[in-house]
Amino acid sequence: MSRIGLKPIEIPNGVEVKVTEDNLCTVKGPKGELVEQMPKEMIIKVEDNTITVSRPSEIKRHKSLHGLTRTLVFNMIEGVTEGYKKTLIIEGTGYRAAKQGKKLVLNLGYSHTIEKEDPEGISVEVPEQHTLIISGINKQQVGNYAAKIRDLRGPEPYKGKGIRYEDEHIRRKVGKTGK
């Protein structure tokens, strides 16, 4: 039984939700507009200021899609009202980030600098040389872009050098001891 799927979603003021017959969900809000194709098996109803998601049968696939669909719609509504952001911390001697127009320039200890173009719908701020703030209205895009940047130089367990999320804790290891 999907407990998450059974919860109705309240539509806040200033947000407009439309669902077509083939479950194409469009959410417009103060921060922008998101369009996403939901699973066709699910039944999505928009009534007054609430959205309910129900499943046609009790087979395993429908049960698993039930909570997923409800969460996807909820994330779209939250994205167009509040937005999402991830903060990355860069640690290490000589490791730093800078912004040049729409390009992010990273010095991560390699022999070359790494330049990344900001994807559509995502903004990257560099308040300090060692901090990146990635924000946007699509939760999946923000998370994917943050993960790609983190993968350029993941944190290592001995000195903690690399790129990590702000709320991430790195388990440190003890180095080898001399004789």
From Swiss-Prot:
Keyword RNA-binding in record: yes
GO molecular function: rRNA binding; structural constituent of ribosome
GO cellular component: cytosolic large ribosomal subunit
InterPro entries: Ribosomal_uL6-like, Ribosomal_uL6-like_a/b-dom_sf, Ribosomal_uL6_a/b-dom, Ribosomal_uL6_bac-type, Ribosomal_uL6_CS
Keywords, ordered alphabetically: Ribonucleoprotein, Ribosomal protein, RNA-binding, rRNA-binding
SUPFAM superfamilies attached to this UniProt entry: Ribosomal protein L6
Top-rank taxon, per record: Bacteria
Keyword RNA-binding applies: yes
Any one GO biological process: cytoplasmic translation
NCBIfam families: L6_bact (TIGR03654)
Family the entry assigns: Belongs to the universal ribosomal protein uL6 family.
Function: This protein binds to the 23S rRNA, and is important in its secondary structure. It is located near the subunit interface in the base of the L7/L12 stalk, and near the tRNA binding site of the peptidyltransferase center.
Listed name of the protein: Large ribosomal subunit protein uL6
Species in which this protein is naturally found: Finegoldia magna (strain ATCC 29328 / DSM 20472 / WAL 2508)
